[in-house]
Amino acid sequence: MTIINTLNLQEIRNQIQKAKKSNPDEIIIIKAGDEEFNRKVLEIKGVNILLSPESHNRKDKLKQRDSGLNEFLCKLASKNNIKIAIDIEQLQKLEKKQKAKTLARIIQNIKLCKRTKTQIILFPEEKYDKLDVMSFITILKGSTEQAKQSIV
């Protein structure tokens, strides 16, 4: 499992190529950025997981939350078989007000992923019980199908 946390696309491509060269089955996780960066990352071959698109410092719009994803990005992720991951450890470290905003953004992302049939998972996977993961997804308005897919 390789986690890449940079905003330079050429550096991301180089790290993916290096990781895939040493181990072709390596899981590549990329930390999300703004929407344009996320779109370019979702178009790169070899990416497996986009981590925490909801975590950013941009303000929400008046009528809509800025959750880091939109319907086009979700369709692109679904087409390229890329999973969207929610970083639970980062969510637990937030203060109450910021945690509420982030949870609202996660709910919006779950709805978008449900509509476009994009797989959503929790990160890190090994740390939590399967029943807890399924419960978390369903509490945040995910379908039971999404909850089952999140533990596989």
Predicted regions and their residues:
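Divalent metal-binding segments
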Residues: 33
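Active-site histidine-anchored catalytic micro-motif
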Residues: 30
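Charged catalytic cores and adjacent phosphate/nucleic-acid-binding surfaces used
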Residues: 1-27, 36-152
